């Protein structure tokens, strides 16, 4: 494909080191492809054959034509479950949808996601699976009996479904504290919440549990 750049609201027009502590999927792909993470508005001076855009979770009103100033082709990369944009206010749902159609193609995580985006009318949908950079991660070294659920009680993470299944196991239940955690979750008596962590700390912590459930 040639020269690739990623674009997100957290981009600073620089590349990440391989030991970056918060290497979530989009950052991991930057590292694997030796590509910079660029800002959505403050464009870099260099030009790219392909720009891969991560639409901000809370502010989807991005301008693809602005990014095309420095990219020959534009792809939108799936962020979260494929239907998450339906939690936006109505105008933003249509804005997000229009951006999907305006992109040269869409990168999704799984074949099931591909079918969804094709059903929306996207002209070219390709699978770009979640990626993890393993360097520096701690192998499992504690064998506890607790069950970890994979997210909080919002549609993005499906925490309620995971919680109901975890209760059937009869073991202690632990949950992460994500950015969308609701305050009332602390009132659930049989869940112990971990503090908010960067990606590397979360993965190292996750590896210590007996069972993980994410539905």
Language model: regions and residue ranges:
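Short, polar loop motifs at secondary-structure junctions
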Residues: 57-60, 110-114, 175-184
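N-terminal pre-catalytic "stem/leader" segment of glycosyltransferase-like enzymes
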Residues: 1-73, 116
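Active-site regions of enzymes building and remodeling cell-envelope glycoconjugates
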Residues: 35-38, 48-53, 71-74, 103, ...
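Short acidic active-site motifs
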Residues: 63, 95, 200-202
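Acidic donor-binding loop of glycosyltransferase active sites
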Residues: 206-215
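Catalytic core of nucleotide-activated saccharide and alditol-phosphate transferases
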Residues: 67-161
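Short loop/helix-cap segments at secondary-structure boundaries that form the rim of catalytic
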Residues: 43-47, 64-67, 116-120, 137-141, ...
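Conserved catalytic-core segment of nucleotide-activated headgroup transferases in glycan assembly
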Residues: 18, 133-199
